[in-house]
């Protein structure tokens, strides 16, 4: 795409982060000599921006590339092409020493509150280590800062002397949030921070993130697959499918007027506790297409790998059968979503972009 959706002129706030035409491919290698036969297009030409103190939601089913986007932005994994600009500076062009400074401004809250905390380290060391590496605090000042961070995240100061296994999942995620705040960042990637938690705990963590955003002026890239959470937490929402953003709009517009077939299917599958009327269910038929792109001379190999995946019924037959069983159910075949044109603005809806299917 040539233009970044929701550019500064179209946004209510100036962007702190701008992603343009980002691609992250992983090589596919086969055979004894590990010949490079193709690529997994995990992220394929993604563009968006995040404003100051804004929360941008990134939603989609598992495997669509959401987490890869977040990790690529933070340079935790290498990118293939494209650019990421943070506070008007090119992140991918930064040297190792410059990247160390960026680390103070960009942090991540991980999905797994158990696996993201070293079980052999005390909470004091987990939260304090980043501050020691960046020489922010030492000695008694370090302990004071750790105690303050724990308190702000709903923990007790004395918890710093315990180990991760002594806490519940929700408490461990609070510790992960405190660690992310240790360096006073401006931008945080929240990689499904509540998906592994009980529903009763999810609201507490979300309220905490909102309070911290107001207090510290944070900007979030909020990665999730729970549309109910995204609806109440995010300012704008980008919908991903097979490595690309297929629709982007502010929260109210997206839920009021979804345009892309995949967005409609996602929203129709989400439970609604306060339905205003009968909602039509939209079903996605067929297997999820492979994100692997084989080179032309490997088409035969691709056919061998994908052999045996044909369903007993064709997608058209399944659609007809579903329609006969339930007239309130609409169907969309995944094959029809493979053609993904660039994002274009929606007429009379500023800030609403869709990969338009005709």
Specify the residue positions occupied by each region the protein language model found:
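Conserved ABC ATPase "signature" region
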Residues: 89-90, 141-158, 267
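Short catalytic/signature loops enriched in Gly
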Residues: 8-15, 28-34, 39, 251-358
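Conserved ABC transporter NBD signature motif
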Residues: 82-90
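P-loop NTP-binding/switch modules centered on Walker-like glycine-rich loops
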Residues: 61, 189, 193, 197, ...
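Conserved ABC ATPase signature
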Residues: 163-167, 171
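A short, proline-enriched helix->beta-strand linker immediately N-terminal to the Walker B motif
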Residues: 182-186
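ABC ATPase NBD coupling module
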Residues: 33-36, 91-107, 133, 254-258, ...
